[in-house]
Every structure is written in structure tokens, then in C-alpha cells.
């Protein structure tokens, strides 16, 4: 358990600086078709990509709560991007609401936050909210999912200029919680994931980005944390299930409707 806590601590603190242990990364994967994921958001600090996010409402982006360990005045949300150096549509953050039961490092439980834009998005080909799941959504072990991010393409590298995507499979949570893997660190709302190849993995600040699972274009998970070594097969990346939090999301976003 001590080793797991140490890994989580390194990763979450790494989110404080781009390019450190919890920057943004997809190792492997492929470039997405431009604007085929119009719900993607880039949370940026002083113009540099920090974490992913997903537009779930014309005024709100969902991300990982630990991504907000920053001075809010330095943060912006950028929508409609394919390449990081393109202009996109930039918003100030009017309000940031972490889940009321969020537990920071080492637990990282309920690792979700809602960010209110200082304007309202008009849905278009390049910017469009992603549908929330039903409160009863179940994503079973073996389910195929995909995620996207602007991350490093190899350990210790630079951010990708273009949005890349990676196919993943949901793993059995009991297995992920055994002593060879996360050793009891995972809460019931967490799920771990694996790519088709051991040389591929999301990691380092792709946190906050959405996982879309199954055939429907519906949000299923938000990436939370991983290991210092992104492709460590015994510390697979972990995401937070969205379905248990749908009531909270609707309550918060409904205030601005």
C-alpha cells in the first residue's frame, strides 16, 4: 500500500508543472480526425496545456479535481482545438466547483470538478457537448473505450501538437486492487484500463480527459491518475466513473441554465 500511495503522490504533485510526472501524455495511439471529438477541452495555465476536460453543457466543462491545484487566475479553458498552437475559443473560468467529497492525494477519491465558462457555447461542428451517461450506466470489464489528449508521445518527451486518441479496455477492478497492482487503493467509483499494447498508455496529465465507451457517444469515465512510469503494466491508469455523479453534475450545471 505504501508504494501505491507514493506513486499517487508523485503523479498528483506533478500536475503542478507541465512536462513533470503528471503532465499530459498518450504514449502510442494515433492522430484523431480533426474535430471528430468536438467536446474536448484544454485546461491551460499561462497558455500551456495542463489537463484535459470535456464539455458537458454549453457553460460547463468536467475535469479532474486535482487539476485545480493552481492559481485560478492563471487558468483558461480552450475549446475547438485540434492543434495546440491554433487559436481555438478561449474562456476565463467563472467558477470552479470540486466534488464536495473530493479527497486529494493520496486518496484521489471523487476526483471530479466542474468549471463554469464565462460565456455560453453555441454548438457547432468543432465545439459540442458530450452527452452524460444515465445514472444506471454500467461499464463492465472487457468493455472497449477510447480517450484522447494532447500529450507526450513518449516518456519524457514534449506535448503533441495534435490531438491523439488511444483505444483502451476496462479491466476487472478486483484484479486491479490486488497486491500486485494498486493494492487496495481503488475506491468503488474507480476503474482501471489497459491499451492493446503494453507500450501504449495514457498518462501524465491526460487526467481530466473523457473516456467514451461502447457504441454510443456518451461520456463514461474521466481519467484520474496513473503511475510515474506510464506503461507500467502493474500500475494501469485509473479513471473515475461518471454515472454515480450525474445527479451532482445536473444539479450544479442546472443552476446556470
From Swiss-Prot:
**Keyword annotations from UniProtKB, A to Z:** Apoptosis, Cytolysis, Disulfide bond, Glycoprotein, Hydrolase, Immunity, Innate immunity, Protease, Secreted, Serine protease, Signal, Zymogen
Gene name? Answer: GZMM
Q: What does this protein do?
A: Cleaves peptide substrates after methionine, leucine, and norleucine. Physiological substrates include EZR, alpha-tubulins and the apoptosis inhibitor BIRC5/Survivin. Promotes caspase activation and subsequent apoptosis of target cells.
Whose protein is this, by species? Answer: Homo sapiens (Human)
Database matches in CDD domains: Tryp_SPc
Q: Biological process (GO) annotations?
A: apoptotic process; innate immune response; killing of cells of another organism; protein maturation; proteolysis; T cell mediated cytotoxicity
Q: Report the sequence similarity comment from the record.
A: Belongs to the peptidase S1 family. Granzyme subfamily.
Taken from the UniProt entry, a GO cellular component term is:
membrane
Q: What is this protein called?
A: Granzyme M
Annotated disulfide bonds: 51-67, 145-213, 176-192, 203-230
Q: Give the residue range of the signal peptide.
A: 1-23
Q: Where in the cell is it found?
A: Secreted; Cytoplasmic granule
Amino acid at each position: 500500500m505504501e508504494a501505491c500511495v507514493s506513486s499517487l503522490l508523485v503523479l498528483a504533485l506533478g500536475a503542478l508543472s507541465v512536462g513533470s510526472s503528471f503532465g499530459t501524455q498518450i504514449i502510442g495511439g494515433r492522430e484523431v480526425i480533426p474535430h471528430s471529438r468536438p467536446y474536448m477541452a484544454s485546461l491551460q495555465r499561462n497558455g500551456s496545456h495542463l489537463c484535459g476536460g470535456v464539455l458537458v453543457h454549453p457553460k460547463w466543462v468536467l475535469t479532474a479535481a486535482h487539476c485545480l491545484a493552481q492559481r485560478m487566475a492563471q487558468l483558461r479553458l480552450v475549446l475547438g482545438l485540434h492543434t495546440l498552437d491554433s487559436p481555438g475559443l478561449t474562456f476565463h473560468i467563472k467558477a470552479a466547483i470540486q466534488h464536495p467529497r473530493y479527497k486529494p492525494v493520496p486518496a484521489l477519491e471523487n476526483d471530479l470538478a466542474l468549471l463554469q465558462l464565462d460565456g455560453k457555447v453555441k454548438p457547432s461542428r468543432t465545439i459540442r457537448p458530450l452527452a452524460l451517461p444515465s445514472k444506471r450506466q454500467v461499464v463492465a470489464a472487457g468493455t472497449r473505450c477510447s480517450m484522447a489528449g494532447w500529450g507526450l508521445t513518449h516518456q519524457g518527451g514534449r506535448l503533441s501538437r495534435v490531438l491523439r486518441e488511444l483505444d483502451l479496455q476496462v479491466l476487472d477492478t478486483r484484479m486491479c486492487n490486488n497486491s500486485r497492482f494498486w493494492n487496495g487503493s481503488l475506491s468503488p467509483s474507480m476503474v482501471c484500463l489497459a491499451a492493446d499494447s503494453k507500450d501504449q498508455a495514457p498518462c501524465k496529465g491526460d487526467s481530466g480527459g473523457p473516456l467514451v465507451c461502447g457504441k454510443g457517444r456518451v461520456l463514461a469515465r474521466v481519467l484520474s491518475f496513473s503511475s510515474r512510469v506510464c506503461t507500467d503494466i502493474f500500475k494501469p491508469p485509473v479513471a473515475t466513473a461518471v454515472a454515480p455523479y450525474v445527479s451532482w453534475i445536473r444539479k450544479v450545471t442546472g443552476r446556470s441554465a
